Curated annotation (Swiss-Prot):
<feature type="binding site">
    <location>
        <position position="89"/>
    </location>
    <ligand>
        <name>Zn(2+) 1</name>
    </ligand>
</feature>
<dbReference type="InterPro" id="IPR042102">
    <property type="entry name" value="RNA_pol_Rpb1_3_sf"/>
</dbReference>
<dbReference type="InterPro" id="IPR000722">
    <property type="entry name" value="RNA_pol_asu"/>
</dbReference>
<dbReference type="Pfam" id="PF04983">
    <property type="entry name" value="RNA_pol_Rpb1_3"/>
</dbReference>
<dbReference type="InterPro" id="IPR007083">
    <property type="entry name" value="RNA_pol_Rpb1_4"/>
</dbReference>
<dbReference type="InterPro" id="IPR006592">
    <property type="entry name" value="RNA_pol_N"/>
</dbReference>
<feature type="binding site">
    <location>
        <position position="73"/>
    </location>
    <ligand>
        <name>Zn(2+) 1</name>
    </ligand>
</feature>
<dbReference type="InterPro" id="IPR007081">
    <property type="entry name" value="RNA_pol_Rpb1_5"/>
</dbReference>
<dbReference type="GO" id="GO:0003677">
    <property type="term" value="F:DNA binding"/>
</dbReference>
<keyword id="KW-0479">Metal-binding</keyword>
<dbReference type="Pfam" id="PF04998">
    <property type="entry name" value="RNA_pol_Rpb1_5"/>
</dbReference>
<dbReference type="Pfam" id="PF00623">
    <property type="entry name" value="RNA_pol_Rpb1_2"/>
</dbReference>
<dbReference type="InterPro" id="IPR045867">
    <property type="entry name" value="DNA-dir_RpoC_beta_prime"/>
</dbReference>
<feature type="binding site">
    <location>
        <position position="462"/>
    </location>
    <ligand>
        <name>Mg(2+)</name>
    </ligand>
</feature>
<feature type="binding site">
    <location>
        <position position="894"/>
    </location>
    <ligand>
        <name>Zn(2+) 2</name>
    </ligand>
</feature>
<dbReference type="GO" id="GO:0003899">
    <property type="term" value="F:DNA-directed RNA polymerase activity"/>
</dbReference>
<dbReference type="GO" id="GO:0008270">
    <property type="term" value="F:zinc ion binding"/>
</dbReference>
């Protein structure tokens, strides 16, 4: 049939296209203009005839017919009467669909305040009127009168009068001398009377004239709201409603159930309440009822409208018949079940199915097995079309019948349809983008989906009953994107870290590991073979074994690209693997001449991908998988109880440690150490013992035993599984055959008595009981952490969703400086690895020769990273998203490599979402990883440095020779570095009080200890000799004798002296006196007085003689808590939320000398006085007040550098940003977050964290507005601020000064430019209230807003379409302009002719 004819019957209206959405307050006129009629009655439908009642909530006259093209009374039916209004029932003949679009309204008999603008904090009405919210509520709910016009009476404007006061005032001043009103009318009139511009002008003047901070804040808040109203064109009185809109009836349906009952939307109940009360109020006013009754009715009307908009926001919740709170309009939007998250962001998808997954080892990497039943259902429309095209059926009905009967020709057609038509598989939870991938379906019998084993890691799938969903991309574009972007073969690398994610695991690894093992004394050792064929023949004949060390000819490509054959040392097993390697200069047999563990295989796949490309990698991965499965099956590796080896020296080690622990108990009994120190030492000793037993066990497992013929025995099967990375870990083996070790209490503390048994020996009852804590905590953690981690991911996605690559290069010269990550002498991440895939921001020079290794603006590849490593470059400045100057989004050069592709990133890549997923995805896995080790405690305390190079030591900073002849570190800026050939290779900062085992200029060997210290106490050390004088150490106030119950030994401990009023001005200290009784002078000229902090244990007494380097007191540090990601996830969240840590560090604001000033109440006063600079200027000193008893890390007279800690602890990120700037903050956040993930062995690229941090730093705070017209203390988006700044400078005004502001991810998400995105995240009511007051416009730039309004997202292929649209729009403008230009001379011509 002709398309035009069809269109008459089914008019398809083109969806209106729009580029932005604006939200604002609706005026009463606007509400009436939307409406199709006033609703006067609370009735819904006639329950006998099921027809809507006239003028009721479902009235057909107002909202439209209930059946297509049919009026209510049935006089006019069918298309031909379209548009006619029936004179009998008044219904327009049109589509029933209009009942979804047409609105009505209710004219209120008395105005009503809109609850959102009244109660949503900060209350907009209260701010407009500059009154407390409580007072406004009293007026609204008819408790008090408010004076609106005082006249000549002494009453004040906005004064509240109770009923009695009002009467009294009327008696006293006369009825007409003043006006006072009550209820919403009063508020409405007051709002009407506000002159926005005048009021704003007055506030500006007051702002300029005030110095008080409180007033400035108050004025600027009110000024903002006034400006918002005047700029958006909203009027304040519109916050009070005189007309209530009624939403279309189809959006609040009434559905008949069987049995004559109805199911209805709660909104109908709420509307009926409003209409009933409104009608009653109208009637009462007509009847001239007494004031008190009318007032009561008005108050009830106000309450019912409140409940309609936001039930429960004020007063008690209105409930329905079944005691359940009614769902109001606000509840429809809010929360997980609200409109935004349930229906707009989380739609259900057609053409999808789900089923259990089973393994498909014979599939290719790009295939999945799809059950025929499912395929038939999913591809129905395609099958119908193909049947029709082939002429096998005439109608759709016929096709349907054929498919339902499963006739033979249908199966052939299904095969045709499915060929080359990819489907998408998804496994919930989809934590990162690899949770949905496309495959080519392969029809299989049965009902389960077959999945390729190698993609399991990406989906985090296993085959213990997991289910997966299948989705069919319908349009050609969707199929194309599925094939080009989502095909499993295009997702070989992980977007989080750029390493292969298609890596063999479990059986495959075991098979390949077994193949690659070489053993001494095997049959056929030393034989030489021509090729693999000959080797296989020999193996079949039993002449040579799989692991024999043989020689064989092998063909590979030389460095110059020539294929050569040469004889190599190998084994038959390794030759089998080598046969699969692709031919390339960089890939030779040397890559597999070792035992292939999981890690090695991963590196092998990485090398193949980097050098031979994607296709070769996919083929290689598939082949290697087949080989691994086959060989693992043939090897038949299994283990029994006797394969678990208990080390011979276990008993000795345990006995030794027991003795040591008893020794510590004795020292504690003798009072040499405190209870806390004893606990720490005992725990430490057992932790070391556990490790020693484990090491012994591993050593025994690795030992190679030979039989009488000199042939090596099979390797232990458990060791093989763990060492290859197939299953199990050293930690698990330790528990099977070593000792289980220390356990943690539920609180996280470590139980002092370890579990000495292992699982093979079996646990005693007490040991079993102790071990249950850990196991139970692990399970409880899992449940809690999964939710936490999911929430973290959601916040991250929300804050970063509009971070998209928008241009190739923003042209900035800024960047950040990267260094290698070194911890305790081990390089954890090399500099080469950190800079890989970035662009250099400046020339990278060889530190020794000064030659340029890599020029600026170069994309750093693997080869360049190797060059940088070889030149021993210490630090490299690279481009980073943090310093990118693109106006919206970021540029490609600042981002660098797209980790999932291994090439520079494309325009349109949604890097923000990828960053969020990369950080959030392991969070969920980590949370689940606590209980795998059964809660065994791991103590993470570092107490020494070792050199990791041979070289020369350089010591800088203050040291003093201690009592035992070693140097003792005396200042906090002491550094120990190791030089190799004059280049600094390592740099350590030993803590205060550490003992240096070397002197400046000593030669050291690799692994030599440089320094050690007690990790459990911080000492206070004297640097001079003399006699101790105790100051202000008053027994019972600042010192208490602590007698240990267990030992009876007394120790003197500094008590908290601030608690008693008499002692509050004490300053407990230890002085060192010279012969003449005066203080000994320190090197910096200060007196040798050492202030004591609360909890310090005194090691010397009054009158004792001390030598330099002697400890005069010890401050115990907290006990060792175990660290697993439980500490980790909340730590990551704390960092991303930019919260102030509790007991945070105090950071010096500038360089200068430290002075202790006069104490203030119970605070210590520390003053930092800057040094006099070259010009003789001296800055203002800065003071800090620090609670007494906190241990201060600096001493009187020390020189301190800006950014150093005065009090140790976790620093507050806001402080770092303020004092040290953006780069220092970025480095701090990246390092801290990486440390948490590194502890769990999860690699994440730094740039993902940087991307999130960039989103947290989007805003600036105005310090001085200059001539920009901005308000001091305001927070603005950077782009908006630059626009204002440029405007002011162009006018010749003074620019504003600003400072960057760090916002936590939740705050940053809520303050995003797009109100749609913010409203769908959290606090929907607040966001929408604010947006409507400001009359905000959403320009639909991010991903989320576009999903919500149902458009293509502006990322990936969508971003390209966006750019095409922009170009087209510009062309349209130009064409229109040209047309206008061409049209201009015409009238003159016409005039001439005339």
């Amino acid at each position: 049939m002709n398309q035009e004819v069809l269109n008459i019957f089914n008019p398809v209206q083109a969806a209106p296209t729009f580029d932005q959405i604006r939200i604002s307050l609706a005026s009463p006129e606007k509400i009436r203009s939307w409406s199709f009629g006033e609703i006067k009655k609370p009735e819904t439908i006639n329950y006998r005839t099921f027809k809507p009642e006239r003028d009721g909530l479902f009235c057909a006259r107002i909202f439209g017919p209930t059946k297509d093209y049919e009026c209510l009374c049935g006089k006019y039916k069918r298309m031909k009467y379209k548009g006619i209004i029936c004179e009998k029932c008044g219904v327009e003949v049109t589509l029933a669909r209009v009942r979804r679009e047409r609105m009505g309204h209710i004219e209120l008999a008395s105005p009503v305040a809109h609850i959102w603008f009244l109660k949503s904090l900060p209350s907009r009405i209260a701010m407009m009127l500059d009154m407390p919210l409580k007072d406004i509520e009293r007026v609204l709910y008819f408790e008090y009168y408010i004076v609106t016009e005082p006249g000549l009476t002494p009453l004040k404007q906005h004064q509240l009068l109770s009923e009695d006061d009002f009467m009294r005032a009327q008696d006293e001043y006369g009825d007409d001398s003043f006006t006072a009103e009550i209820g919403a009318e009063a508020i409405q009139n007051l709002l009407k009377a506000i002159d926005l511009d005048k009021e704003a002008e007055r506030l500006r003047e007051e702002l300029a004239g005030t110095v008080s901070d409180m007033k400035q804040k108050k004025f600027s808040k009110r000024l903002k709201i006034l400006e918002a109203f005047s700029e958006s064109g909203n009027r304040p009185e519109w916050m009070v409603l005189t007309v209530v809109p009624v939403i279309p009836p189809e959006l609040r349906p009434l559905v008949p159930l069987d049995g004559g009952r109805f199911a209805t939307s709660d909104l109908n109940d709420l509307y009926r309440r409003v209409i009933n009360r409104n009608n009653r109020l109208k009637r009462l006013i007509e009847l001239r009822a007494p004031d008190i009754i009318i007032r009561n009715e008005k108050r009830m009307l106000q309450e019912s409208v409140d409940a309609l908009f936001d039930n429960g926001r004020r007063g008690r919740v209105i409930t329905g018949a079944n005691k359940r709170p009614l769902k109001s309009l606000a509840d429809m939007l809010k929360g997980k079940q609200g409109r935004f998250r349930q229906n707009l962001l989380g739609k259900r998808v057609d053409y999808s199915g789900r089923s259990v997954i089973v393994v498909g080892p014979d599939l290719k990497l790009h295939e999945c097995g799809l059950p025929k039943k499912m395929a038939l259902e999913l591809f129905k429309p395609f099958i119908y079309a193909r049947l029709d095209a082939k002429g096998l059926s005439g109608t759709v009905k016929q096709s349907k019948r054929m498919v339902e009967r499963e006739q033979p020709q249908v199966w052939d057609i299904l095969e045709e349809v499915i060929r080359e038509h990819p489907v998408m598989l998804n496994r919930a939870p989809t934590l990162h983008r690899l949770g949905i991938q496309a495959f080519e379906p392969k029809l299989i019998e049965g009902k389960a989906i077959q999945l390729h084993p190698l993609v399991c890691a990406a989906f985090n799938a296993d085959f213990d009953g997991d289910q997966m969903a299948v989705h069919v991309p319908l349009s050609l574009e969707a199929q194309l994107e599925a094939r080009v972007l989502m095909m499993s073969t295009n997702n070989i690398l992980s977007p989080a870290n750029g390493r292969p994610i298609i890596v063999p695991s479990q059986d495959i690894v075991l098979g390949l590991y077994y193949l690659s093992v070489a053993r001494e004394g095997e049959p056929g050792e030393g034989k030489i073979f021509a090729d693999l064929g000959e080797i296989e023949a020999a193996m079949d004949a039993g002449v040579v074994s799989l692991h024999a060390k043989i020689k064989s000819r092998f063909t590979e490509m030389d460095a110059d690209g020539v294929v050569r054959r040469r004889v190599i040392d190998t084994t038959p097993g390794r030759m089998k693997i080598a046969a699969l390697l692709p031919q390339h200069t960089a890939i030779g047999h040397r890559l597999i001449e070792k035992a292939l563990t999981k890690k090695e295989i991963g590196n092998l796949i990485d090398v193949v991908y980097r050098h031979c490309g994607q296709k070769a990698t996919v083929i290689f991965a598939d082949q290697i998988m087949g080989l691994g499965f086959k060989e693992a099956a043939k090897a038949g590796i299994s283990f029994g109880k006797d394969d678990i080896i208990i080390p011979k020296r276990k008993e000795a080690i345990v006995a030794e440690t027991r003795t040591l622990a008893e020794e510590y108990e004795q020292q504690y009994a003798d009072g040499l150490i405190t209870k806390g120190e004893k606990y720490n030492k005992v725990v430490d000793a057992w932790a070391k013992a556990t490790d020693r037993v484990a090491d012994e066990m591993m050593a025994e497992l690795q030992m190679k035993h030979k039989d009488e013929n000199g042939r090596e025995k099979e390797i232990n099967a458990i060791y093989m599984m763990a060492h290859s990375g197939a299953r199990g870990s050293q930690a698990q083996m330790k528990q099977l055959g070593g000792m289980r070790g220390l356990m943690a209490k539920p609180s996280g503390e470590i139980i002092e008595t370890p579990i000495v048994s292992n699982f093979k020996e079996g646990l005693t009852v007490q040991e079993y009981f102790n071990s249950t804590h850990g196991a139970r905590k692990g399970l409880a953690d899992t449940a809690l952490k999964t939710a936490n981690s999911g929430y973290l991911t959601r916040r991250l996605v929300d804050v970063a969703q509009d971070c998209i690559i928008v241009e190739e290069d923003c042209g900035t010269t800024r960047g950040i400086t990267l260094r290698a990550v070194v911890e305790g002498g081990d390089v954890l991440v090399s500099l080469g690895a950190r800079v890989l895939g970035r662009f250099s921001a400046e020339d990278i020079k060889d530190p020794a020769t000064g030659e340029i290794v890599v020029p600026a603006d170069t994309y750093l590849t693997e080869n360049m990273a190797d060059l940088i490593e070889a030149a021993a470059v210490q630090s490299v400045k690279v481009r980073s998203v943090l310093t990118c100057e693109a106006k919206i989004g970021v540029c490609g050069a600042c981002y660098g490599r797209d980790l999932a592709r291994g090439t520079p990133v494309n325009i349109g890549e949604a890097v923000g979402v990828i960053a969020a997923q990369s950080i959030g995805e392991p969070g969920t896995q980590l949370t689940m990883r606590t209980f795998h080790i059964g809660g065994t405690a791991q103590v993470a305390e570092q107490s020494f440095f070792e050199s990791s190079n041979d070289g020369t030591v350089r010591v800088t900073g203050a040291t003093v020779v201690g009592t035992d002849g070693f140097l003792v570190v005396m200042s906090r800026n002491t550094a120990v570095s190791v030089l190799v050939d004059g280049k600094e290779r390592e740099n350590y900062k030993p803590p205060y009080g550490a003992r240096l085992k070397i002197k400046d200029g000593d030669k050291v060997k690799r692994g030599q200890r440089l320094a050690d210290w007690d990790p459990y106490t911080t000492p206070i050390i004297t640097e001079v000799a003399g006699k101790i004088r105790a100051e202000d150490l008053v027994d019972g106030f600042s010192v208490r004798e602590e007698t240990d119950e267990a030992t009876g030994i007394a120790q003197r401990v500094i008590a908290d002296w601030r608690t008693s009023a008499r002692a509050s001005d004490l300053r407990p200290a230890m002085g060192v006196l010279a012969e003449d009784g005066s203080y000994v002078r320190l090197a910096n000229g200060g007196e040798a007085r050492y202030l004591m902090s609360v909890g310090a244990i005194l090691s010397v007494g009054d009158g004792d003689m001390v030598k330099p380097g002697e400890v005069i007191a010890r401050i115990p540090t907290e006990g060792a808590k175990t660290r697993d990601i439980t500490g980790g996830l909340p730590r990551v969240a704390e960092l991303f939320e930019a919260r102030r840590p509790k007991d945070c560090a105090v950071i010096a604001e500038m360089d200068g000398r430290v002075e202790f000033g006069k104490d203030y109440k119970n605070k210590r006063r520390i003053k930092i006085t800057p040094e006099v600079d070259a010009d003789g200027n001296q800055g203002e000193p800065v003071e800090f007040l620090i609670p007494k008893g906190k241990h201060i890390a600096v001493h009187d007279g020390d020189f301190i550098a800006r950014g150093e800690y005065i009090i140790d602890g976790n620093p507050d990120p806001h402080d770092i940003l303020r004092i040290l700037g953006v780069e220092a903050l970025a480095n701090f956040l990246v390092d801290e977050i990486q440390e948490v993930y590194r502890l769990q062995g999860v690699p994440i690229n730094d740039k993902h964290i940087e991307t999130i941090v960039r989103q947290m730093l989007q805003k600036v705070e105005i310090l001085e507005p200059g001539d920009t017209g901005l308000i001091k203390g305001d927070h603005l988006d950077k782009p908006e601020f630059y626009v204002e700044q440029d405007r002011a400078v162009a006018r010749g005004g003074r620019p504003a000064t600003t400072q960057p502001v760090l916002l936590g991810i939740t705050k940053a998400s809520l303050q995003t430019k797009s109100f749609i995105s913010a409203a769908s995240f959290q606090e929907t009511t607040r966001v929408l209230t604010e947006a409507s007051v400001h009359g905000k416009t959403d320009t639909l730039e991010g991903l989320k807003e576009n999903v919500i309004v149902g458009r293509l997202i502006p990322a990936g292929t969508g971003s390209y379409l966006r750019s095409l649209q922009r170009v087209a729009a510009k062309r349209d403008e130009q064409l229109a302009q040209q047309r206008e230009d061409a049209m201009e001379p015409l009238p003159a011509v016409i005039a001439e002719e005339a």
